[in-house]
Amino acid sequence: MPKKSSSVYETVDAWEAVWGDGVVPTWLAGMTVGFVLLFPLLKMMFPKTIKKHGAFLLAFEIVAFFPLFYCAYEGATAWWFKLDDFTTKEQRLYATSPHARNVLQCNFAFQTWDFFASMLHKETAAPEMLAHHLLAALLCYWAITMPYMHYYGV
């Protein structure tokens, strides 16, 4: 749980914030299992129309749909129904938003998974793409462990 500090905003234990509640490991496991099941299934179902690389990219995109849809749902829910919870400028800067935290945890898991999955295919293993995934995951990690501007994150 977040600990109150003497400052305006909450500080959190990094390990607990990212891994402690099981959200990130669950997303990582779900995406991995989904990909491992879909990839051979797609190759088997469409042997003539989808070659090995086509099956990889299709399985990759199908798996990526779920965390991206979840982030869109959480963001839309927060935007339309929860922004009134932040009434002061201090709250808009320093308060923790459960919806932003959900988006950040899901996106951290997705970017981490995407980094390793991208290394398995030459089209997605370009250095700039891998750097993008690492930097996006790092930004999510920082936003989870040092809550700042969650109001603007959704």
Predicted segment positions?
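Membrane-helix and juxtamembrane interface regions of eukaryotic multi-pass membrane proteins
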Residues: 1-154
